[in-house]
Amino acid sequence: MALKPEWKGYAWILLATVTGSTVYVFSKAALIEVSLFQFGFWWFSMAIGWNLLFTLRSPESRRIRIISRSTFKVLLIMGLVEMVATGAFYAAIEASANPSIPSFLRNMEYIFVTLLGIILLHERFRGWEIAGVILSITGAFVISYQRGGTLSSYLTGSSGLMLLCTSFYAIRTILAKKFIHTISPTQMAINRALFLFTLATVLLVVFGQSIRIPQSALISILAGSFLGPFLTSISQYSALKYIEASRAAIIQSTTALFTVTGVFLYFGKLPMAYQAVGGIITIGGVMLIMAGARLKATGESRNAKKMPTA
């Protein structure tokens, strides 16, 4: 029996959530041994390979499509946004002693998605959404708390990098949702990997670093690049074809819970008690934001049905 489209969407986003949590574990394991530029070179070169293999096996993806000028512009913008967002993301993981912390802070993306909706689409906040934003920001501050820390140390540390990362990821999310029916998930994933591989290669050459890395780091990158840039990206973009972004966001907000488990099993580390509390607060905030968005959408749908027809 074929799955309903909605259930396909839930299956895709659940897969993206679980595989996405492993990215924090494998990338941190590799970044302990190699530089950020070496990591990016191997991580995204492998991601390109995984995506090309998937393209060859998929009849839909094998169809040659001529990319229009407008599509090229969108892919260019998305690629540049990914350079900033993903570069800051992995820099945050490298800077953090426990990769669970960036995974909790990743939920700030939904705050920026909501704010961009207000700025670009002139949307209005509901009470639940306001409460969710306040709760998420509170949780982020709790997670980022450092006794004796300065604004400079915050901005250059893991928390500041995640602030930069999530603001740009929000732009990426809105672009992906808008163009998901004209640009395939595979095209988006390959475009992302190509831009990031190019950036890492240029920086590797500029700073005169070698592409030779330890075998243990290569194994971590091999596993992580399959689960992260390939499987997570394909799953995220595929889910958006079947379910609303708000539903996907609610499920993906729990990624940090899977990450905590993975980090504990791999590194034997757990977040501090106050960091765990802050993380749970941010997850609760995201769920309130998305619940408010769904209530608003439901209300607008009902009002549209009540409108008289000519």
Question: Which residues does each PLM region occupy?
Answer:
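Hydrophobic/small/kink-forming positions within alpha-helical transmembrane segments
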Residues: V18-S21, V25, G79, M83-G87, ...
